[in-house]
Amino acid sequence: MLISITGGEEEYRALEQEIGSFLERIDAFQAADSKASNAVLSVFGGERKRVSEAFSTPAEIQYVAIAGKFDNVKEVNNGALQVVRHLLNYDYLWNQVRVKGGAYGVGCRFNREREGYFTSYRDPNLSATLEVYRHAAEYLEQYDAKEREVTKTIIGTISGIDTPLTPYMKGKRSLSAYLTNVTEEMMQKQRDQVLNCDIEDIRQTADVVREVIRDGVICVIGNEKKIAEEEKLFESIEPLQ
């Protein structure tokens, strides 16, 4: 068992006084209680598979996502990826999916586990949005901007990293770093990579984005008719209950 606490010495001492009785209650948990608990839980079963799937609804809007891994990319600049995430979210994806496409929102993300995703919500489109995702790597390869624009993107990225944190947020970040084996040195390295990012670093991340799309599977929640029109994209289509 791992217990995380955020607080001062007084809170820590209070936890120490209570943890013993808490563990005793766990030890006293009877089989009958276990069965009663399981009765109200849906038990996951079956083999997990990578499939592109859609869930149909009567709504006229879609939620369009594609997610994949980029294990095959040898060298990854995690700081540059954070800059690219900001750039895609507030430039390419914003303009193509939100402004031109009419979606309420859109975004992408990449993590240290070499996973990435693109997603839109309240989106009137389906295949057009997927096509935008597929051309994101091309956008990065051809990216060109004045130094001032690159600096603005870096500032926007670093502001999300260096934002003031509440005690709750500090505790959450600390626990997440502990569970994922992220050290202070790793976080500082990523911060330095963000600050030192240039146009060439941005262009080189195209390999990561291209691999996410190549490896990716699609998941869509949306209009039944639109999904039926694009049924070849999916290995599974089910009504959303």
Predicted region positions:
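M16 family metallopeptidases and their MPP-like homologs
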Residues: 1-7, 62-84, 92-199, 205, ...
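His/Glu-based metal-binding/catalytic segments typifying zinc-dependent metallopeptidases
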Residues: 4, 9, 16-20, 24-98, ...
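Nucleic-acid-interacting cores, centered on viral/eukaryotic replication and modification enzymes
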Residues: 11-13, 150, 196, 210-215, ...
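Short amphipathic alpha-helices in soluble, non-transmembrane regions
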Residues: 16-23, 131-136, 233-234
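C-terminal structured interaction module
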Residues: 30, 223-241
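Glycine-rich, charged/polar anion/phosphate-binding loops
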Residues: 48-53, 104-105, 203
